[in-house]
């Protein structure tokens, strides 16, 4: 097992309901360390760039609108197999299919307003982290 870093976003549906601390508690209980974190208002340009892989999908504009509808908390998480571990901790994209105790089962409102984003690979984690953090902001 390797120590990895992954990228997380606590989405607007969760920040609106003041769930950052509760979500952080789930993350830390799973053995992941939060080595960088900041609350930001994502711009339309940032959201479009971040979700560019989905630009041809019918839900793209709704996704950009949602992600810019309120503050988000961007994070760098670190730990053993952090990418896979955080995806397990988040739960299935559709909260109806998420396992008990996962972030999405506990806090999500819908498949879109599902409270959290996590990188899907180590490579994408590196790209996503670099979009929001400089190296000197990551203090592990």
Swiss-Prot record:
InterPro entries assigned to the protein according to its UniProt record, in alphabetical order: NDK-like_dom, NDK-like_dom_sf, Nucleoside_diP_kinase, Nucleoside_diP_kinase_AS
Gene3D superfamilies recorded: Nucleoside diphosphate kinase-like domain (3.30.70.141)
Domain of life from the UniProt record: Bacteria
Cofactor section: Mg(2+)
Active site as annotated: 117 (pros-phosphohistidine intermediate)
Subcellular location, record wording: Cytoplasm
Coiled-coil stretches: none
Catalytic activity annotation: a 2'-deoxyribonucleoside 5'-diphosphate + ATP = a 2'-deoxyribonucleoside 5'-triphosphate + ADP; a ribonucleoside 5'-diphosphate + ATP = a ribonucleoside 5'-triphosphate + ADP
E.C. code: 2.7.4.6
GO cellular component terms, semicolon-separated: cytoplasm
HAMAP family recorded: NDP_kinase
Protein family: Belongs to the NDK family.
Complexes and interactors: Homotetramer.
NCBIfam families: PRK00668.1 (NF001908)
General function of this protein: Major role in the synthesis of nucleoside triphosphates other than ATP. The ATP gamma phosphate is transferred to the NDP beta phosphate via a ping-pong mechanism, using a phosphorylated active-site intermediate.
UniProt protein name: Nucleoside diphosphate kinase
Primary gene name: ndk
């Amino acid at each position: 097992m390797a120590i990895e870093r992954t990228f997380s976003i606590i989405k607007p549906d969760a920040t609106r309901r003041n769930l950052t601390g509760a979500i952080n508690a789930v993350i830390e209980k799973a053995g992941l360390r939060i080595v960088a974190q900041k609350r930001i208002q994502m711009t339309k340009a940032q959201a479009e760039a971040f979700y560019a892989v989905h630009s041809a999908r019918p839900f793209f504009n709704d996704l950009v609108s949602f992600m810019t509808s309120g503050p988000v908390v961007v994070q760098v998480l670190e730990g053993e197999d952090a990418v896979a571990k955080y995806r397990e901790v988040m739960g299935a994209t559709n909260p109806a299919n998420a396992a008990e105790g996962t972030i999405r089962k506990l806090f999500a409102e819908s498949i879109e307003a599902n409270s959290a984003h996590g990188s899907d690979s180590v490579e994408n984690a590196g790209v996503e982290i670099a979009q929001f953090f400089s190296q000197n902001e990551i203090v592990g």
